[in-house]
Amino acid sequence: MANISSPFGQNEWLVEEMYRKFRDDPSSVDPSWHEFLVDYSPEPTSQPAAEPTRVTSPLVAERAAAAAPQAPPKPADTAAAGNGVVAALAAKTAVPPPAEGDEVAVLRGAAAAVVKNMSASLEVPTATSVRAVPAKLLIDNRIVINNQLKRTRGGKISFTHLLGYALVQAVKKFPNMNRHYTEVDGKPTAVTPAHTNLGLAIDLQGKDGKRSLVVAGIKRCETMRFAQFVTAYEDIVRRARDGKLTTEDFAGVTISLTNPGTIGTVHSVPRLMPGQGAIIGVGAMEYPAEFQGASEERIAELGIGKLITLTSTYDHRIIQGAESGDFLRTIHELLLSDGFWDEVFRELSIPYLPVRWSTDNPDSIVDKNARVMNLIAAYRNRGHLMADTDPLRLDKARFRSHPDLEVLTHGLTLWDLDRVFKVDGFAGAQYKKLRDVLGLLRDAYCRHIGVEYAHILDPEQKEWLEQRVETKHVKPTVAQQKYILSKLNAAEAFETFLQTKYVGQKRFSLEGAESVIPMMDAAIDQCAEHGLDEVVIGMPHRGRLNVLANIVGKPYSQIFTEFEGNLNPSQAHGSGDVKYHLGATGLYLQMFGDNDIQVSLTANPSHLEAVDPVLEGLVRAKQDLLDHGSIDSDGQRAFSVVPLMLHGDAAFAGQGVVAETLNLANLPGYRVGGTIHIIVNNQIGFTTAPEYSRSSEYCTDVAKMIGAPIFHVNGDDPEACVWVARLAVDFRQRFKKDVVIDMLCYRRRGHNEGDDPSMTNPYVYDVVDTKRGARKSYTEALIGRGDISMKEAEDALRDYQGQLERVFNEVRELEKHGVQPSESVESDQMIPAGLATAVDKSLLARIGDAFLALPNGFTAHPRVQPVLEKRREMAYEGKIDWAFGELLALGSLVAEGKLVRLSGQDSRRGTFSQRHSVLIDRHTGEEFTPLQLLATNSDGSPTGGKFLVYDSPLSEYAAVGFEYGYTVGNPDAVVLWEAQFGDFVNGAQSIIDEFISSGEAKWGQLSNVVLLLPHGHEGQGPDHTSARIERFLQLWAEGSMTIAMPSTPSNYFHLLRRHALDGIQRPLIVFTPKSMLRHKAAVSEIKDFTEIKFRSVLEEPTYEDGIGDRNKVSRILLTSGKLYYELAARKAKDNRNDLAIVRLEQLAPLPRRRLRETLDRYENVKEFFWVQEEPANQGAWPRFGLELPELLPDKLAGIKRISRRAMSAPSSGSSKVHAVEQQEILDEAFG
């Protein structure tokens, strides 16, 4: 008889077996059992087990023996102890002895325990309740759950997980189902345990193939949430199969669950063991018997679902039938309820709403076809709103849902899931089950990638995206997964290394966004796969060091040297910059291919997004040099240099230059064939949350203006990040358009390593502090899915850490250099002596002829035709005006093989209708660019030069940044940007401050960009007057740029040519005229272009020609620009020979030698004045007032200023006031 009082119940056999092993060899038993087994006393058995025996008589004898009469067995041998009725029945049943040849075996171990337990169960008076429960919702939601788990961390949820948890919840409502019967002092007693300990019947198969059953308990189930319950369930099952269950696992089971349905049993009445009040049985899921012969289509049409039979076998002494029936009804209701499934989905971090129970909708199939198509359209348009893209999931109770994406909204129910509908080519099919449609839609638009493309107007692009996105997910190969993991290892290990070795140093780490490294790697790899020439990266400071090390390939030793502050003074001219602003260049080699590609990272300042237009210009210049461009018909080499731009989320939404740069994307003068944008979306800007920093749903909404597809991706899913990166490159190559990837992640630390973000975002950083990084979560997913082993993951990380440690130790041993003051970069580039800028007369004539060499049938505008004729006349006869002098300079450079690029607002015609560099046919709109004719020699051979002139968008910041970048990408090009009025250049002040004036000193980045800034006081008001000379002079130092305000067309001509030919890569700032464009005196003769060069200091022509007498001069007026002509006119009017006007044509660097030589010619001068139109606090005086006395102390120590009074605005808003002020300047100058 079984030991009913044993705490192990039907598991007692296992305990006895372990005891025997322990007795023979204690080390063969898990140590956790030792304490229990030391004093364990097994129940005595009737006899030792015997090996099976077989009767050996012949077959005839077997039959005879079977027929022979047998002595009836004694009642004591056959009756089960306990119930008298059972014993009497047993006594009446004669059990014949084994026949000859039968196999006879004494039962032992598990088999013997079954005998005991089953005999003991006969003493429990039981009854059984049965309930059939619809299984469709259970099936459908389990599919949703496991599909999500398959794509993320791996693992599966079984039906028994769900049914067991529902059972536990039902017990909370019916605690009587958890109690058991016993006798206390001989009195019948019902015991209600404090906790629900659910026993799981676990079928085990031994090494010999024999099967056995154990019942192990999940303790205190009522305290668990679903995820905890699943973890405990899996732990019990795993330990049971590994033979590692402990005594505690067997004791104290209060209610059991058995699932014979796993082997196809539909309806089971299990036996109830003493010590429990109920055992719940689960049958197989089957269609009702009468429908099992029907086809799937017919079953779906009728709305027939599978059923699962639940049985509750209970101790009738303490549980009544009504309680048992209500208990099953509660489980039934739970399995169909919204609340139960909501909790399950939340606990498993399934971000979507569960399938909801509802009755079938009998609408016609035609109507539902339309509804299914509407559902498909809804997912394509709105699916991104339901995508699981936020790795933090700050609102864990919130499901990713949208009414437009729910099947119920479209009049569809779970009964439609297995019905077939017409889908009109969706995923390459005409008909599909709704379940398959939903599965594809969820995978395409609502997993870890959200796709926005409904704003794209081109149907071909939308169809291409649909075909690429709406496909079955293909998991990367194991080799690819290991490679992705290696990149994550590298990204995380690099940051951890720096954090450990350089505590407290700012580095703006990538922690929390490590997946951007495999993402960038994949994008570059795909560019290499397409056979492209180069990827140029522009990015802010966050993560920059990581990108330099793990993407560009900058040597670790160099990065660590910069952290040490150990710079070699022989290599460090200029101010330098912080390590997270520097650029680098490297070569990328494909891991799974044979191609390579150049990779470079351009330098940038801390001004967020300022590098964006610079990068675009740099790339366009490289493309123009390669001359692949859009003329490549097959598209493979077209735009073969790819800009890869990284952004922050707050900056992408907040900085206006982003929109300005995006606006360049499809413009002829600026197009680069598509930029790959990656937004490292930390979901915070310094300390500002998104709801305070943007008004749009996404930080990427601004990109919709150019029809760029937008991919939102979860940064905790590196495989998704890699897939999106490759898709982005493919789209860019196919359509030559921008693509935006919004990688949602988080910032592990504050804005910098010394910042504590929890002060302003406490809840967010409570979540972040406990968040496992992308590397760990991806490693766990790979191991959970069985793709790699833990050892493989650990070995890869150790290898990388060891590499960093070795380099770190090497850097510590490098030569140490003492800290020295930085040296100027001024002497790094010197103007060559004897540089000739004059040209032959024949070239002037050829340029003049070009303006009348109109194509056949071309009709110039009647107001432009006289301009063209006048230009030809000037080329031969002289009196060359400013506009033509400029075109002569540019045309001559084209003829000499230079690429000349001129852009700006209205620059093709010119703000003041002066340039007319591109002619438009009056009738057809055809365009003709005369200077492009200079790109061909007279014999028809190409010179190698080009004249590219573009009207820019109405932008300064991006436009100037682009032109600066162009000069970095093509140092030999002559690149000019013209402001509409010089006043508006301050819209590009960040570019001027951070790149143009200081790029060489900070980064060694050279540029020869030319800014043409119309300037002059002419009564047009404060915003059409000043290009802010004072600001450029304040920025000038170390020869960082040339600043000039020429006053003659010929000097402007020579200035441009000197700049293009001197080999110096430094910017040129030219303050150009407005009214002087048509001033009759502001002209130059042909000899001024063919015989001389640029002169930084000009005297009046009378003195230069030897007509005027310098000895009569007692006062010198130093001035610059168009004011000279007003002063000269007044001098002529007043006949003042005691006064001379000297022009400073170059404002910086100040031409000290030329100025001294000029002033030394006037021996009797007693007064020096600086005369300017600008207010006293503006123009050149704020610098010249300090610098001129220091430059020439013997002459200019007492120099005085004549100007407008100090003003906050550049000028008066009244033209009449302007005239009065201008007159006062002249009066004072000649007073």
From Swiss-Prot:
Map out region (2-oxoglutarate dehydrogenase E1, C-terminal part) in residue numbers.
Answer: 338-1231
Q: Show the GO MF annotations.
A: 2-hydroxy-3-oxoadipate synthase activity; 2-oxoglutarate decarboxylase activity; dihydrolipoyllysine-residue succinyltransferase activity; magnesium ion binding; oxidoreductase activity; oxidoreductase activity, acting on the aldehyde or oxo group of donors, disulfide as acceptor; thiamine pyrophosphate binding
Coiled coil (UniProt feature): 787-817
* Protein name from the UniProt record: Multifunctional 2-oxoglutarate metabolism enzyme
Reported consequences of knocking out the gene: Attempts to disrupt Rv1248c in M.tuberculosis H37Rv and Erdman strains by homologous recombination were unsuccessful, raising the possibility that Rv1248c may be essential. However, deletion mutants were readily obtained in a strain derived from H37Rv in PubMed:19936047. The mutant strain grows as well as wild-type in medium containing both carbohydrates (dextrose and glycerol) and fatty acids, under a CO(2) enriched atmosphere, but shows a marked growth defect when grown in medium containing carbohydrates as the sole carbon source in the presence of CO(2).
Q: What is the activity regulation entry?
A: Alpha-ketoglutarate dehydrogenase and decarboxylase activities are inhibited by unphosphorylated GarA, and allosterically activated by acetyl-CoA, the main substrate of the TCA cycle.
| Quaternary organization | Homodimer. The 2-oxoglutarate dehydrogenase (ODH) complex contains multiple copies of three enzymatic components: 2-oxoglutarate dehydrogenase (E1), dihydrolipoamide succinyltransferase (E2) and lipoamide dehydrogenase (E3). Interacts with the FHA domain of unphosphorylated GarA.
The UniProt record lists the EC number as 2.2.1.5, 4.1.1.71, 1.2.4.2, 2.3.1.61
Q: What does the entry's free-text domain comment contain?
A: Is a fusion protein with two major domains exhibiting structural features of an E1 and E2 protein, and a short sequence stretch of E1 localized at the N-terminus, which is connected by a linker region to the rest of the protein.
